[in-house]
């Protein structure tokens, strides 16, 4: 049932101008700020851990802005996953900084690792690069049974989407050996799949689990790493 509901919501938001979607996303974020929910609790806890010296009013201001941006990002999925190819790619305006260096690295055929955290326009970045390069994208399967929608959306412009499991790791290795591009969100938890171990390192004064997969692949295969967002 959730799959059909999500599909209907994606089609609805894809039918709207992007500015309308952003306005509705801001409204949705406001609701997430007022109504208790897991996204609110996690963000509130993280802000308290990272900025304990900040007054509660300032942390609440950051929390509200965070949830509004989250709402906008959620309502961008319909346009990104359903709009025609050219309309999606037109969202990337002007030259992309560093793309000449990226293209040169790809042409060396030794494999390239492209990393993007859950920050900024990372969904759009994946679509853009998969339209230009042979890209294998690592993702964590949804707990809501929405894998088919996610795979289709993220792979619609040519990317191969693989899960954070042993099969996905093999697919990454094969793509790297072919000299292709890997797309990895380095803030994912992929512990338990071989090279998916993590190290706990200081982050804003807290020990944060950090994947070692990217550094291991880069060192083992002499693959350059590019950051995008």
Annotated model-derived regions:
Residues 28, 32, 123, 186, ...:
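Short, flexible micro-motifs
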Residues 83, 108-166, 171, 192-207:
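Catalytic core of membrane glycerolipid acyltransferases/transacylases, capturing the structured
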Residues 134-136, 166-229:
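Membrane-associated lipid acylation/remodeling enzymes share a hydrophobic transmembrane-juxtamembrane segment
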